[in-house]
Structure formats: C-alpha cells, structure tokens
Amino acid sequence: MNINIFRRRFTPWSVDGTMVIGGKIFCDTLERPNRHLPAGRYKISLIPTKQKKVSETKKKNKYERGKYEIVIKPVILLRSNYVPRTVRRRARFVPGNGPLRLRNKSIILGRSHYTGIVTQSEKCYNEFCQLLDEEFKRMKKKYLPCRINLFIRDWGVDEIPLNYLLIFQ
C-alpha cells in the first residue's frame, strides 16, 4: 500500500497538504512549518501503547486512577529497519485542529476549510487507523511482509497531478 502526501501550501503558521491513498483523495493534512518531515519516502508501522483510560462519567473527562487501555497508533519510521517500542517522541499521525501544539514532526489528519485549520480530525484519524489495521491483517493473512510506504512530496500548487488519481490511471 502506498500513501502519498502532497504538500500544497507553505505559510508561516502551517504546511497544508492532501493525502492520496490508492488513487483516491483520503483527507487533508496539516504540519508545523519549522518542524515538518523532509520530503521523501518513509515506512509506517502500528505500535501498541498504554494510555490512561477516560472515566465513564461525563464530568470534565477525568481520567480513572490507575486504569489503562492498550491503543494502537500509526508511527512514521524515520530509519527503515528500526521499529521503536514506544510512540513517545516519534513522528506519527495525530488528530488535532491546528499545528502550533504539534511536536516531533507529527502530521494532523482532517478536512481543511481554511489555511492552517482542519476539522473532523478525529473521524479522519479513526478511518485512517482502521484502514491501516485492515491492510496489516490482509498482509498477515497472505503471509506477506507488511509494507506500507509513505511518500511525501513538496508540490507547492493546489492541483494534485492527475497520474496519481485512480480515474486517470
């Protein structure tokens, strides 16, 4: 599976892009302008992490003391043969609204309405994680090595090249 990110707009407060998966436009991306990944080829891995569990009560989303849950998160591997044990301080895909609180070269997924702001990020992030999980299960069932490649291209214009879209192939 190949995932392409075309960076379209470079502004002082954000780097806006579009994610294309399997020849279809999946969602928009957002990155911090001075801490984004350089353009190139990367691999994606799913890593299980321990996260505090949110309490069942609707009061202020307090965390339950001492209770954790296992969450699988997509991580961008900067070195090809090294898979980290944790996702702390790693480049990864995250939900969010704006790039200014981003760290570690992470990428926000969502629907872009204005330059530097995305909406519906939780929905896009969950769909992306589900898509990656299905791909890993499909590859595991066929006894093939799990290869998910991420290609980041600095495009600089709003139009995505037609040869990357499915209807023009």
What are the residue ranges of the model-derived segments?
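Cell wall/extracellular polymer interaction/catalysis modules
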Residues: 1-148, 152-169
